[in-house]
Amino acid sequence: MLAGTWEALVTGQVDLAIGISGEYANPGGIELRPLGELAFVFRVAPHHPLALLQGPLEDAQLVHHRAVAVADTAQRMTPITVNLLPGQDVLTVPSMRSKMEALLRGLGCGFVPEPFARAQIEAGRLVHKETARASPLARLHYAWRAERSALGLGRALQWWLAQLESPVTRLALLERHAGLLP
């Protein structure tokens, strides 16, 4: 959903991007359709110092604790940073799986998609903390290169696009993450 995904699509490294942000200027030749909205919630391990604090957490409190962030893979486009505070120490990890592992170990704190952390909350392995600032809501899309070739879209891409027309498929992609992350 960061710039690296757009870059891979625009440069032809991928034919289809699922979960991409629609906030970037479309350079042309890219078809974009809504996937849905995904709420991000603030999570920490039960043994993290922020877990003990009462009430909504203020930015002035958060800035003193290391955030865990997934690195943007963009090489040519400007990388994007989200939900980090100026001056905050950051542990940058390569994937959402790594971010969840770091949060579970108490190595930092951070916003994660609500469905990704649902099982850990239910198991008591992570704690939900309210923040004074609004929790982010991501409007996600799926996108593909419309001008793929003179022969048209490949069969696999056509199949995926047909599947993505279904609201059930789109909801499953947003909500069903049990067993995929630690």
What are the residue ranges of the model-derived segments?
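C-terminal regulatory
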Residues: 26-107, 112-137, 151-154, 158-182
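Central regulatory/effector-binding core of bacterial HTH transcription factors
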Residues: 1-26, 176-180
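Catalytic strand-loop-helix junctions within cyclic-nucleotide turnover domains
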Residues: 148
